[in-house]
Each structure stands twice: as structure tokens, then as C-alpha cells.
């Protein structure tokens, strides 16, 4: 575009756009936000709105599109959801006061991690943005949720651990240094950057001194020691950079972020992303929703704050029995006091999302409806606090926050804010009558102009005695008094003639001019005055930010603990004994999700007992559909529930604290990375073997399925041995398998115990009993299961024939292998698998390759005799029969 064609407005737009090249610029023009050039083309396509142009007759028109300012939030949310950043550029000057171009500037940058509008956020999940930085000693991570004020930091030793931590926390956006990928290992581990919207900051924004000073300035402190992060330099660097990023996006200080909390991975039960997915903690594998996941059973919270805390507790179970039992004490009280618990939950139902309301208020994004919701929530506190203090003893249920009912804040909102306040803060209609005398007067002028004019007219008629006197208005003279000419002799001396007409005279008075000043612009003054009063109320509320934060925190905990008590009561859960022992003993345990998905049916409970003395590895065999996977998962879920502080679905439960849970359940191809099902399976298994400890719980559901039978069996056998012998202590493991040969491990490994899922056979049918019983089984019932699945009868019949042939052949193979191998050492597999074909297999191969059409009868008889002799003498090393027969051919 040539310079002469650039208008001042376009020049202003281009200047602001140059500062935000990676964002779609919402440029405020009157009642619309306009977008131009490439932004308009992108936004029109993403939002499905009309793309038009500015200066259509120009040979090079400017593409443009726009959205109404009052509905802009919805359009912004849609763009952000599609991965765009949006820079909101507002008019920061009253157009009536502008002597030229209205001043504009970007007031907010909205990104996936910077959303504040609760309508476009998942109420049950935090909306974190994460910053990561590498350095000597590992990786520093910081997570900040601008919508709640939560600010968490940690430091880990490896990029792989950082990657897993990011997956577990689930941020919506990443912030990385520009040269982050120069660390090749970090770049590989942090491939999350390819899956999440990622912003880059200059390296200097992550520097030690700069980030530390930024945190000290924000928290108004001289040291970071009080936050416990002074010895975490990488975490400090990540936190300082993230704070800078958020402040830049919001264009202001984020005063509602009042603390920063350090945490460490070894404080919590480690559940990697693969295990969390396999166990379906937060979403099911089928379609990624909550239905059918553990969270759907446990999350009976009634507030958004409680739902977010429940999700966090499920992702971060504890490993400290003392803290776990403190939670269990509170849940037990909530379970036992059902009537009080229900009253508490009823009160909580009236509480809105105080955390996000507090944040919106602090950042200047709250409207009248937000304050009304906050006031309605705070009204519940006196009743709620009284119920807690009078009935519960747990400090988690009646903390010090119960001494503060925030009645002063609730009263302020109740007196000032209308319940039916409009969504806009500059439209008026927010403040209740009677709260401000000046506003009441201005509002009266704005809403009752006709009545005031009639009153003034009646007053002047009475004062002058002129019955034809009228008070009128036009745009030229404003308000005036009109008197017919035949009565002008009676006008008072303070009337000033303004205009002479044929039949009347028009006058003004000082009182009328004062009235005009009040009435004209009364609506504008009312709206402006309301906004000023509203901001004063907001400032007073923001002054109580710490009190609101404490109340929100306690409400979330009360909601979670009451919900867990409710679930335990209604589902028949028991309180687990959680200690530092090495025992896992679940009596009559059930799968918490599956039992809820069997309406009208009884879930078959099972006893699961493990320890480090004589029953550490449970080798579980049995047919498909019998329930092996269910038993495995329910054990892991019971441990997770116990260590998060929940009761568990069992008659009795003893849980020696577990530090890590690993699962290897099923596998999917990772074709985009060139990885097969078997490779994925082996990677998951390698992760387990390289990271277990003697306090871990390992769940293995079929190892070695993605390769040949003998390879798979060999790997499964070796994995089981490794876990049994791990550092002389072993690892508690539940190992489901169809390799019945693995049951022989009990002969050489004392802490391996065989179990199977019982079935009954009747008339060639199988009945699944779903009971875990001691002992192994050598039957898989695969053909029966195939028949249940609807495989055609002809295929079933043929399957039985093939199975019989294979079983007969296998019996011969086992007999030969046992005879050939002799006695084996303690660590040897009891049935050795030959690496070479047996003589019988070689004979079969030779027969298959022979061409009898070119052989004489005598040659055929000689070859047949030779093959027969070799099969009869298996103890002799197999010769290359194939080569010999080829020579004879």
C-alpha cells in the first residue's frame, strides 16, 4: 500500500498490529471490534462471518470484518479455542474529548491460558499456563491459573520427568525460552510443545536475577524463603518468566495472585500419563469424556471450586500416612453425620465460583452480575460456618476461616448491586436505588424528565397566574417558557425574552437554565456516575482479597470432603487402614466404576492380598471376558482412592503406602512416530522396569502379545523374574497372562503365587464366575469366547480342529524339549523352548518342498525312509533334511 493511501486510522492500526504480530487484533471502532488485512481473512474463516473490505472502490481495498463489542467475548473464545491469540485494542479516550484520532491501545491479550470468562472455561478444571526452563540440575516448571490465582512451581531432574509433570498438570498453554530446543534431550522430551499452543520469551526473561527480582517485587517481600523456593533456582526462573508473561498479557499487575506454592514429585503417588489413561482416572479411553472414569464416581461436589480440587486430589494422591489419615478423619465425620452433611451440601449449592469471581474482580473484568453472584455466595457463609463449627472436629472442615463470615462484604454488595444487573458495566442499571443520594437524583432526572417538566410548568403557572404558560423544548433554544402575547403584561421581571413569535413570546430564566443543565445529559451522567460508584465498590472488595481467598479455599475443601463422605455412605465404602507397611489387603473389594455400570446386577467382589514376604507377584490366568483386567484395575484404583484420602469399595482394606503405580494395559500403534504395537508395549514395559521401587505397584495385563508366541513368552518370563528379584526386595505386581507356562514360576520363585478367574463348564458352554481364586489354569476358552462374540459356526468348528492339532503337536514338542534339556538350574525356564526347528518340523518342511511329480517311486521311498528314521531318533542333532532331499531331487 502506498503511503498517501494510508489514513491516520489505518496508520494507527498498523502501528499497534506491529507490536502484536502473532495475535489477531480486535480494533475497537465505536460499537464494533474491527479486523483488517490478514487478520480479517483468518477471523472471517474461523468465525464464519462476512469478509468485506474498506474502500471498496479503491484498486487495492483493505479486507475487513467485525463483531459487535457487546458480544465480543464469545467470538474471542471461539478464536482462542481454535489456537489463535487475540489482542483486544480498546478506545481509551472519550471520543467527545478527542481533538483528532481517538487514542487506542491493547488492554488485554487473550490466549488459551489467559481466559477469564467463566462461560468459556471448564468449571471442573484449572486453566493453567506453564513455563519451563532447563539448566544445570534439571528443569524448572511453573504453573499459573489466572482465573483462580493458583501459582505452583516445581523442579525436576530430567526432561522426561518434566514432560510427565506437564501431562499430569494439564496446562492449556506453554511458555518457553526462544532457544529451548538447543537442549536436544529437553526438546525430545518436551514434545508437548507440538501439542499445545506455545509462546516464546527472550532468554533474558528467564535470567536468574531478573526473575528473582520480579517475584520479590510482585509479592512485596525481601526474600523468597517464606515461599520455600529459595533453593530452587530453575523453578524461580520459570516462575519469574511466567509472571512476566501473564502481566504482559493482562497489561496490569495480577494482585489476586498472593502466594506461590512449591511442590515436589516425591510428595505424591507417582502415576504417569500412560497409567492414568489406562486406569481411566479423569476420562475414559473410549471417547475421552468423564463418563465411565473414576472421577465420575467420586466427584459429587456441588461447587466449581470443589470440582477442581477433587480433580487435583485424584491426580496427586499422597504418600504421607499422617496427612492421608487426617483427610480420612474428615471424610469419616462427613460420612457418619449424614443429616449435617446434607445441610452443608445444600448450603454449598448456593455458592457460586468464588475463586474465579474473585479473580475477575481483581483484574477489573467483573460486572454487576459477578458481584451479585459473589454477594449471594457470601450470604451462605454464616450458616455454613456455624454448621461446621458446631458439628465437626476435623481442622480440614472447620479451619480458622470459619471465624470470618465476610458479612461486611456481603452487606456492601447487598446494599449496592442490583440482582438483575445488566452484563455491561458502562450501560447503567447496576446500582440499587438508595445506595448513593447523588445517583438517585441524577437517575430521577434521567427517568422522569416529563414529570419534572410538568411540575416546573405547574409551579410557574401558580407563581405568575398565567394559565397559558407552557414549558417546552427544541434543539435550537433548549428549554424555554412560552406565553401567549395577550398575557405578556403579567410576566415576572426575571423572565428574559429569547424569541418573539406571531402569537407568543418565549422566555428563559436562571432556574430553567439550571434545570436544563441537569436534565440534558442526565442519562450520560447517570451511567458515568454508576460506573464510578461501581469501581469504588470493586476497589473495596479487592481490599478484602485475602479474606475471600481463605473462604474460597475452605469452601473447596469442605465440598470435596463432604462429597467423599456422601459417596462412601451411599456406595458402601470402608475406611482403609493406611500405613507404611508393605501389605496390600483388599477384602471383598469391588471396581468403583464397573459396579455402577451394572444396574440390577451384583458385582462379584474379590479378595486381593499382596505382601513382600510370600505373595508379592500374583500370576493371574483365565479366559478373556472373565474379569482379569477388572481385578487388576480395581486394585490400583483402591490404592489411589485410599491415598487421596477417600474411602474404598471393600469390606476391609489395608494399604501400605505405594510410591508409584505403573500399568501396562493394551497398546496402540504410534504410526506417526513409526512405532508398532509391540514397540509401544516394550517402551511402556521398559519405563516400568527402569523406574520401579520396592514400594511400587505394577499392573501388567498381557506382556508380549505383539510378537511371536515364543518371543512373547520369553520376555514375559524374564520381566516377571526381574520384578521378583528387584534389588532383593521385589515389587508388588499383578500379572495377567494367557501364557500358562508362566505359572511354573512358582516352582522357582517363592513370592510368586498363581491365581485364576474361575469359570464353570457345562455342555461345552462356559459360565463366567468373575471370582479370583488361588491356583493356575491352562485353559483360555478362546474359542468359546469367539462363539459368544458371534463368529460363524463353521469358523468355530474349524478352530477346534486346528486347536487339537496344535495341542497334539505341542505335547510332542514339550516331551522332546524336556528330554533334551535335562535338569535345569534354579533360574532356568522349566520348559526350555528350542531356538531351532524340531526334527519333526524339519521333516514336515522337507515333505512340503518335495516335488513328487519328478521323483521315481524308488527315490520317493528312500526319502520317506530317511525322514522316518530322523523323526524316530530325536536325540540325534537334526540334520539338514531339506538340503538332503533337494540333493536327491
Swiss-Prot record:
This protein's record includes keyword ATP-binding: yes
SUPFAM superfamilies registered for this protein in UniProt: DNA repair protein MutS, domain I, DNA repair protein MutS, domain II, DNA repair protein MutS, domain III, P-loop containing nucleoside triphosphate hydrolases
InterPro entries given in the database record: DNA_mismatch_repair_MutS (IPR005748), DNA_mismatch_repair_MutS-lik_N (IPR007695), DNA_mismatch_repair_MutS/MSH (IPR017261), DNA_mismatch_repair_MutS_C (IPR000432), DNA_mismatch_repair_MutS_clamp (IPR007861), DNA_mismatch_repair_MutS_core (IPR007696), DNA_mismatch_repair_MutS_N (IPR016151), DNA_mismatch_repair_MutS_sf (IPR036187)
Gene Ontology BP annotations: mismatch repair
Keyword Transcription: no
Binding-site positions, ATP: 622-629
Pfam families: MutS_I, MutS_II, MutS_III, MutS_IV, MutS_V
CDD domains, sorted: ABC_MutS1
Disulphide-bridged cysteine pairs: none
Family matches, as Gene3D superfamilies: 1.10.1420.10, DNA repair protein MutS, domain I, MutS, connector domain, P-loop containing nucleotide triphosphate hydrolases
GO molecular function: ATP binding; ATP-dependent DNA damage sensor activity; damaged DNA binding; mismatched DNA binding
Record keywords: ATP-binding, DNA damage, DNA repair, DNA-binding, Nucleotide-binding
Chain segments carrying region Disordered: 869-889
Cited PROSITE patterns: DNA_MISMATCH_REPAIR_2 (PS00486)
Cellular component GO terms held in the UniProt record: cytosol
Reported function: This protein is involved in the repair of mismatches in DNA. It is possible that it carries out the mismatch recognition step. This protein has a weak ATPase activity.
Entry's family note: Belongs to the DNA mismatch repair MutS family.
Listed name of the protein: DNA mismatch repair protein MutS
Source organism per UniProt: Desulfatibacillum aliphaticivorans
Amino acid at each position: 500500500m502506498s503511503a498517501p493511501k494510508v489514513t491516520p486510522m489505518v496508520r494507527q492500526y498498523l502501528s499497534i498490529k506491529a507490536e502484536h504480530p502473532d495475535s489477531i487484533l480486535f480494533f475497537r471502532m465505536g460499537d464494533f471490534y474491527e479486523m483488517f488485512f490478514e487478520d480479517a481473512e483468518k477471523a472471517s474463516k474461523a468465525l464464519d462471518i462476512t469478509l468485506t473490505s474498506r474502500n471498496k472502490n479503491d484498486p487495492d481495498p483493505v479486507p475487513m470484518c467485525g463483531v459487535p463489542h457487546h458480544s465480543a467475548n464469545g467470538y474471542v473464545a471461539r478464536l482462542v479455542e481454535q489456537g489463535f491469540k487475540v489482542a483486544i485494542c480498546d478506545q481509551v479516550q472519550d471520543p467527545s474529548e478527542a481533538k483528532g484520532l481517538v487514542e487506542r491501545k491493547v488492554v488485554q491479550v487473550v490466549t488459551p491460558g489467559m481466559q477469564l470468562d467463566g462461560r468459556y472455561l471448564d468449571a471442573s478444571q484449572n486453566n493453567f499456563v506453564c513455563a519451563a526452563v532447563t539448566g544445570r540440575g534439571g528443569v524448572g516448571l511453573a504453573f499459573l491459573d489466572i482465573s483462580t490465582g493458583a501459582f505452583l512451581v516445581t523442579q525436576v531432574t530430567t526432561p522426561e520427568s518434566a514432560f510427565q509433570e506437564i501431562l499430569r498438570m494439564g496446562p492449556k498453554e506453554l511458555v518457553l525460552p526462544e532457544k529451548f530446543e538447543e537442549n536436544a534431550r529437553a526438546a525430545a522430551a518436551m514434545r508437548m510443545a507440538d501439542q499445545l499452543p506455545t509462546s516464546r520469551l527472550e532468554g533474558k526473561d528467564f535470567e536468574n536475577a531478573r526473575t528473582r527480582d520480579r517475584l520479590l517485587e510482585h509479592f512485596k517481600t525481601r526474600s523468597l524463603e517464606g515461599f520455600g523456593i529459595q533453593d530452587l533456582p530453575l523453578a524461580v526462573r520459570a516462575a519469574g518468566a511466567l509472571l512476566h508473561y501473564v502481566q504482559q498479557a493482562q497489561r496490569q499487575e495480577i494482585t489476586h495472585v498472593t502466594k506461590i506454592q512449591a511442590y515436589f514429585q516425591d510428595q505424591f503417588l507417582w502415576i504417569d500419563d500412560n497409567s492414568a489413561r489406562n486406569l481411566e482416572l479423569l476420562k475414559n479411553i473410549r471417547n475421552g469424556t468423564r463418563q465411565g472414569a473414576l472421577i465420575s464416581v467420586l466427584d459429587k461436589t456441588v461447587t466449581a471450586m470443589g470440582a477442581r480440587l477433587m480433580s487435583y486430589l485424584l491426580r496427586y494422591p499422597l504418600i504421607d500416612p499422617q496427612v492421608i489419615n487426617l483427610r480420612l478423619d474428615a471424610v469419616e465425620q462427613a460420612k457418619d453425620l449424614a443429616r449435617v452433611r446434607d445441610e452443608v451440601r445444600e448450603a454449598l449449592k448456593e455458592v457460586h465460583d468464588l475463586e474465579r469471581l474473585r479473580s475477575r474482580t481483581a483484574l477489573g473484568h467483573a460486572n454487576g452480575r459477578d458481584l451479585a453472584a459473589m454477594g449471594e455466595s457470601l450470604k451462605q457463609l454464616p450458616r455454613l460456618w456455624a454448621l461446621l463449627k458446631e458439628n465437626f472436629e476435623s481442622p480440614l472442615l472447620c479451619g480458622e476461616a470459619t471465624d470470618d463470615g465476610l458479612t461486611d462484604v456481603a452487606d456492601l454488595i447487598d446494599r449496592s448491586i442490583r440482582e438483575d444487573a445488566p452484563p455491561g458495566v458502562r450501560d447503567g442499571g447496576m446500582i440499587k436505588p438508595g445506595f448513593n443520594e447523588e445517583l438517585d437524583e441524577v437517575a430521577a432526572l434521567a427517568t422522569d424528565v416529563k414529570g419534572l417538566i410538568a411540575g416546573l410548568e405547574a409551579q410557574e403557572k401558580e407563581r405568575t397566574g398565567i394559565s397559558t404558560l407552557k414549558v417546552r423544548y427544541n434543539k435550537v433554544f433548549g428549554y424555554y417558557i412560552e406565553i401567549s402575547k395577550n398575557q405578556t403584561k403579567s410576566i415576572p421581571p426575571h423572565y428574559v425574552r429569547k424569541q418573539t413569535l406571531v402569537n407568543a413570546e418565549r422566555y428563559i430564566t436562571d432556574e430553567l437554565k439550571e434545570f436544563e443543565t441537569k436534565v440534558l445529559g442526565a442519562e450520560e451522567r447517570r451511567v458515568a456516575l454508576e460506573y464510578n460508584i461501581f469501581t469504588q465498590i470493586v476497589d473495596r472488595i479487592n481490599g478484602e482479597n485475602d479474606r475471600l481467598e481463605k473462604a474460597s479455599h475452605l469452601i473447596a475443601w469442605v465440598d470435596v470432603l463432604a462429597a467423599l463422605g456422601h459417596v462412601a455412605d451411599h456406595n458402601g465404602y470402608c475406611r482403609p487402614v493406611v500405613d507404611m507397611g508393605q501389605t496390600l489387603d483388599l477384602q471383598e473389594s469391588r471396581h468403583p466404576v464397573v459396579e455402577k455400570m451394572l444396574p440390577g446386577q451384583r458385582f462379584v467382589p474379590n479378595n486381593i492380598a499382596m505382601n513382600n514376604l510370600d505373595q508379592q507377584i500374583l500370576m493371574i490366568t483365565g479366559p478373556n471376558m472373565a474379569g482379569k483386567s477388572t481385578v487388576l484395575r480395581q486394585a490400583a484404583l483402591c490404592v489411589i482412592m485410599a491415598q487421596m484420602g477417600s474411602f474404598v469399595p471393600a469390606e476391609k482394606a489395608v494399604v501400605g503406602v505405594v510410591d508409584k503405580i505403573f500399568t501396562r494395559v493394551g497398546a496402540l500403534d504410534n504410526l506417526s512416530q513409526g512405532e508398532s504395537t509391540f514397540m509401544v508395549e516394550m517402551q511402556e514395559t521398559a519405563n516400568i522396569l527402569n523406574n520401579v521401587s520396592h514400594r511400587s505397584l505394577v499392573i501388567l495385563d498381557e506382556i508380549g502379545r505383539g510378537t511371536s508366541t515364543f518371543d512373547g513368552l520369553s520376555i514375559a518370563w524374564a520381566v516377571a523374574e526381574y520384578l521378583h528379584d528387584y534389588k532383593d526386595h521385589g515389587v508388588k505386581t499383578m500379572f495377567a497372562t494367557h501364557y500358562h507356562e508362566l505359572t511354573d514360576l512358582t516352582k522357582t520363585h517363592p513370592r510368586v503365587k498363581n491365581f485364576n478367574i474361575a469359570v464353570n463348564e457345562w455342555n461345552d458352554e462356559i459360565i463366567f464366575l468373575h471370582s479370583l481364586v488361588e491356583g493356575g489354569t491352562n485353559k483360555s476358552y478362546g474359542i468359546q469366547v469367539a462363539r459368544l462374540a458371534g463368529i460363524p459356526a463353521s469358523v468355530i468348528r474349524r478352530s477346534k480342529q486346528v486347536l487339537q492339532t496344535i495341542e497334539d503337536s505341542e505335547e510332542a514338542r514339550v516331551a522332546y524339549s524336556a528330554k533334551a534339556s535335562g535338569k535345569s538350574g534354579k533360574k532356568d525356564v522349566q520348559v526350555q523352548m528350542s531356538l531351532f526347528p524340531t526334527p519333526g518340523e524339519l521333516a514336515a518342511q522337507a515333505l512340503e518342498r518335495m516335488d513328487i511329480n519328478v521323483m521315481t517311486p524308488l527315490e520317493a521311498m528312500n526319502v520317506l525312509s530317511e525322514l522316518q528314521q530322523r523323526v524316530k531318533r530325536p536325540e540325534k542333532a537334526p540334520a539338514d533334511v531339506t538340503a538332503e532331499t533337494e540333493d536327491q531331487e
